């Protein structure tokens, strides 16, 4: 029984050390806005009272003595305890690495992508599976905007050799699942190829849809033209300058329904498009006027349009109808947008006050391209996406962090980094 108790205490001590050392570690501290602020307040010292408010640590223990005893057993020498035993800090002898090209390259070579976890898997289960696979600096569980685990993670090993050794094992399984394991560079190269392929497919699909739409438009136009063969009647002569389309409607109102009239006031000729055979409408109108069909008291030459001339005239009329429809549609869209002068409104009702509701946050996400991490600070859980906070003036212990980027950015831009406030689901 005593041995079991000792083992449980040892396991707890290990978990406490790992969790706190993660908070102050190379990966998290530069990205943790809240903890960076705390570090600046007292020469790097952070009260244990503050630390136990962090979610994952508080689940392990909130007892100061247990935390201190665990940290004393750590062999990393990353953390220091103050004389009063109420505060801890990252040792000044172990400053954060400088964010230069060497560090970025090292980060890339230490990073590994793994896919194949069931989406119900939690961080503790992943950490347990990775226990015997080398020291790991960070585990990033990739999630959707809806906070659903995608089944894939990015690991950052402590060393390049650790990552290389992990990549050499191509037969890794999680429970019964075969795992897809890629280096970070391989992953981004694969995503780039997929994007190129998708772009090519989308382009081909767009071209096909455009061609189909064009064909449908041509078929519709051809059908429309066929339905209107024999429906055009041209009129010309010394027309009265006040002749209007209304005069033509009046002239044929009981003899043939008119669909469209291509005519402007003052012109000497025009074309009438009937919804029926134009010859029938003309014959009826002539018969009703003793074969002397005049327009506003003026003699008119009436001609049926046929052949190529008919096709050209129909095409022109169809285009005119469409243009008129588009203009009318545009006017209707603006019809009720304003009142009075300048469209500002002249009604007497009081204007509604719009309450400012804060800055709107938008997230870019796609199923495989973007990640979002939930991060937690004491007393408050927030969601952060595509945000990076650089070091504040005088912050010797917090170098700037790489910018977080979506996976559709260039692979060589560096590691995907979130501005987090510490843990909740991702370490």
UniProtKB/Swiss-Prot annotation:
<keyword id="KW-0694">RNA-binding</keyword>
<dbReference type="InterPro" id="IPR045180">
    <property type="entry name" value="La_dom_prot"/>
</dbReference>
<dbReference type="InterPro" id="IPR012677">
    <property type="entry name" value="Nucleotide-bd_a/b_plait_sf"/>
</dbReference>
<feature type="domain" description="RRM">
    <location>
        <begin position="110"/>
        <end position="202"/>
    </location>
</feature>
<dbReference type="Pfam" id="PF00076">
    <property type="entry name" value="RRM_1"/>
</dbReference>
<comment type="function">
    <text>La protein plays a role in the transcription of RNA polymerase III. It is most probably a transcription termination factor. Binds to the 3' termini of virtually all nascent polymerase III transcripts.</text>
</comment>
<dbReference type="Pfam" id="PF08777">
    <property type="entry name" value="RRM_3"/>
</dbReference>
<dbReference type="GO" id="GO:0045727">
    <property type="term" value="P:positive regulation of translation"/>
</dbReference>
<feature type="compositionally biased region" description="Basic residues">
    <location>
        <begin position="327"/>
        <end position="342"/>
    </location>
</feature>
<dbReference type="InterPro" id="IPR006630">
    <property type="entry name" value="La_HTH"/>
</dbReference>
<dbReference type="GO" id="GO:0010494">
    <property type="term" value="C:cytoplasmic stress granule"/>
</dbReference>
<dbReference type="InterPro" id="IPR002344">
    <property type="entry name" value="Lupus_La"/>
</dbReference>
<feature type="compositionally biased region" description="Basic and acidic residues">
    <location>
        <begin position="405"/>
        <end position="427"/>
    </location>
</feature>
<dbReference type="InterPro" id="IPR014886">
    <property type="entry name" value="La_xRRM"/>
</dbReference>
<feature type="domain" description="HTH La-type RNA-binding">
    <location>
        <begin position="6"/>
        <end position="98"/>
    </location>
</feature>
<keyword id="KW-0539">Nucleus</keyword>
<dbReference type="GO" id="GO:0005829">
    <property type="term" value="C:cytosol"/>
</dbReference>
<dbReference type="GO" id="GO:0008033">
    <property type="term" value="P:tRNA processing"/>
</dbReference>
<feature type="compositionally biased region" description="Basic residues">
    <location>
        <begin position="351"/>
        <end position="360"/>
    </location>
</feature>
<feature type="compositionally biased region" description="Acidic residues">
    <location>
        <begin position="365"/>
        <end position="376"/>
    </location>
</feature>
<dbReference type="InterPro" id="IPR035979">
    <property type="entry name" value="RBD_domain_sf"/>
</dbReference>
<keyword id="KW-0597">Phosphoprotein</keyword>
<dbReference type="GO" id="GO:1990904">
    <property type="term" value="C:ribonucleoprotein complex"/>
</dbReference>
<dbReference type="Pfam" id="PF05383">
    <property type="entry name" value="La"/>
</dbReference>
<dbReference type="InterPro" id="IPR036390">
    <property type="entry name" value="WH_DNA-bd_sf"/>
</dbReference>
<feature type="region of interest" description="Disordered">
    <location>
        <begin position="319"/>
        <end position="427"/>
    </location>
</feature>
<feature type="short sequence motif" description="Nuclear localization signal">
    <location>
        <begin position="315"/>
        <end position="331"/>
    </location>
</feature>
<protein>
    <recommendedName>
        <fullName>Lupus La protein homolog B</fullName>
    </recommendedName>
</protein>
<feature type="region of interest" description="Disordered">
    <location>
        <begin position="193"/>
        <end position="220"/>
    </location>
</feature>
<dbReference type="InterPro" id="IPR000504">
    <property type="entry name" value="RRM_dom"/>
</dbReference>
<feature type="domain" description="xRRM">
    <location>
        <begin position="226"/>
        <end position="348"/>
    </location>
</feature>
<dbReference type="GO" id="GO:0005634">
    <property type="term" value="C:nucleus"/>
</dbReference>
<dbReference type="InterPro" id="IPR036388">
    <property type="entry name" value="WH-like_DNA-bd_sf"/>
</dbReference>
<dbReference type="GO" id="GO:0003729">
    <property type="term" value="F:mRNA binding"/>
</dbReference>
């Amino acid at each position: 029984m005593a041995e079991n108790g000792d083992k449980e205490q040892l396991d707890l001590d290990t978990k406490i050390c790992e969790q706190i050392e993660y908070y102050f570690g190379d990966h998290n501290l530069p990205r943790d806005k809240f903890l960076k602020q705390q570090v600046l307040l007292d020469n790097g010292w952070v009260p244990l009272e503050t630390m136990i408010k962090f979610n994952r640590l508080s689940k392990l223990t909130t007892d100061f003595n247990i935390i201190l005893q665990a940290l004393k057993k750590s062999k990393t020498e990353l953390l220091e305890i103050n004389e009063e035993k109420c505060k801890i800090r990252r040792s000044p002898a172990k400053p954060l690495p400088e964010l230069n090209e060497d560090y970025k390259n090292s980060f890339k070579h230490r990073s590994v992508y793994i896919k194949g976890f069931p989406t119900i898997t939690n961080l503790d289960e992943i950490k347990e599976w990775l226990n015997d696979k080398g020291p790991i600096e960070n585990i990033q569980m990739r999630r959707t905007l809806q906070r659903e685990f995608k089944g894939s993670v990015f690991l950052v090993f402590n060393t390049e050799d650790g990552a290389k050794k992990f990549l050499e094992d191509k037969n890794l399984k999680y429970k019964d699942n075969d795992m897809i394991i890629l280096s970070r560079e391989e992953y981004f190269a694969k995503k780039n190829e997929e994007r190129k392929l998708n772009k090519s497919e989308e382009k081909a699909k767009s071209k096909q849809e455009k061609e189909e739409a064009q064909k449908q438009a041509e078929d519709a136009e051809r059908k429309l033209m066929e339905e209107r063969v024999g429906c055009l009647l041209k009129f010309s002569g010394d027309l009265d300058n006040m002749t209007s389309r209304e005069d033509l409607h009046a002239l044929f109102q009981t003899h043939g329904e008119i669909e469209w009239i291509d005519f402007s006031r003052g012109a000497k000729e025009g074309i009438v498009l009937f919804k029926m055979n134009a010859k029938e409408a003309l014959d009826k109108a002539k018969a009703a006027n003793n074969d002397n069909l005049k327009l506003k008291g003026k003699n008119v030459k009436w001609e049926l349009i046929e052949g190529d001339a008919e096709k050209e005239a129909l095409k022109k009329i169809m285009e005119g109808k469409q243009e008129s429809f588009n203009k009318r549609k545009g006017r209707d869209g603006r019809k009720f947008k304003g009142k009075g002068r300048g469209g500002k409104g002249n009604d007497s009702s009081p204007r509604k006050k719009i309450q400012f509701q804060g800055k709107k946050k938008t997230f870019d996400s796609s199923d495989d391209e973007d990640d979002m991490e939930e991060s937690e600070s004491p007393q408050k859980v927030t969601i952060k996406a595509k945000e990076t906070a650089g070091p504040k003036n005088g912050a010797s212990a917090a170098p700037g962090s790489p910018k977080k980027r979506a996976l559709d950015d260039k692979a060589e831009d560096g590691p995907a980094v979130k501005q987090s406030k510490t843990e909740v689901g991702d370490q």
